[in-house]
C-alpha cells in the first residue's frame, strides 16, 4: 500500500473536516477545516488539496443512523460525494461515520481544550477518526469497497 495518500472528509452543514493519511496509508492526521458553503467553493478547495497532496483516494464519512440506515443528512452527504466524484480523477468512497463527532469532541475535551478550541478543531479531528477507522478496516478486509462511480460526461 505504498504511496497511497488518502484524504477523508467529515461533511457537515457548515464545515467540512479534512484529514490525510501518511504515504503508506497507515496513520491518519487532521489536516484542515473548510467552509461547506458555497458547495462549489468547497469542492474546488478539496480538488486543490487532492492535487497538491498527491491524493490517490478520497473517503467521505456517511452519517448513517444508529440502525445503519440512511437519513436525510446521509442523502445530503451522498449528493455532495457524487458531485465531488465527478470533479476528481481519483476514486471516492463512502465510509460509515457513526459517532465520530461524539468521539472527536470527547477526545478534545479530555485534552482539556476550551469550547472555542474544540469547535475550531472538531471537524478535522472527526475526519481523522473516520480515516483511521477506514484505514484499519481496509487492512483487515482489503477487498471491501464503497467506491462511487464517476460520471461519464
Swiss-Prot record:
S-adenosyl-L-methionine found in the keyword field: no
Keyword annotations: Cytoplasm, Hydrolase, Nuclease, Ribosome biogenesis
A matching Pfam family: RuvX
GO molecular-function terms, A-Z: nuclease activity
GO cellular component: cytoplasm
Parts forming coiled coils: none
Locations listed in the record: Cytoplasm
Kinase keyword on record: no
Listed InterPro entries: RNaseH-like_sf (IPR012337), YqgF (IPR005227), YqgF/RNaseH-like_dom (IPR006641), YqgF/RNaseH-like_dom_sf (IPR037027)
EC number per UniProt: 3.1.-.-
Domain of life: Bacteria
Enzyme class: hydrolase
Any one Gene Ontology BP term: rRNA 5'-end processing
Main localization (coarse): cytoplasm
Family: Belongs to the YqgF nuclease family.
Function, in words: Could be a nuclease involved in processing of the 5'-end of pre-16S rRNA.
HAMAP family per UniProt: Nuclease_YqgF (MF_00651)
Protein name (Swiss-Prot/TrEMBL): Putative pre-16S rRNA nuclease
Organism: Chloroflexus aurantiacus (strain ATCC 29366 / DSM 635 / J-10-fl)
Amino acid at each position: 500500500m505504498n504511496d497511497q495518500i488518502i484524504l477523508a472528509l467529515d461533511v457537515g452543514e457548515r464545515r467540512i473536516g479534512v484529514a490525510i493519511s501518511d504515504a503508506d496509508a497507515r496513520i491518519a492526521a487532521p489536516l484542515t477545516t473548510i467552509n461547506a458553503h458555497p458547495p462549489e467553493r468547497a469542492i474546488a478547495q478539496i480538488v486543490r488539496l487532492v492535487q497538491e497532496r498527491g491524493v490517490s483516494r478520497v473517503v467521505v464519512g456517511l452519517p448513517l443512523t444508529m440502525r445503519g440506515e440512511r437519513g436525510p443528512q446521509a442523502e445530503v452527504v451522498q449528493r455532495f460525494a457524487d458531485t465531488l466524484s465527478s470533479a476528481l480523477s481519483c476514486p471516492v468512497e463512502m465510509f460509515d461515520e457513526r459517532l465520530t463527532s461524539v468521539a472527536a469532541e470527547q477526545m478534545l475535551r479530555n485534552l482539556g481544550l476550551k469550547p472555542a478550541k474544540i469547535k475550531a478543531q472538531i471537524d478535522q479531528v472527526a475526519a481523522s477518526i473516520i480515516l483511521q477507522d477506514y484505514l484499519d478496516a481496509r487492512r483487515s478486509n482489503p477487498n471491501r469497497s464503497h467506491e462511487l462511480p464517476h460520471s461519464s460526461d
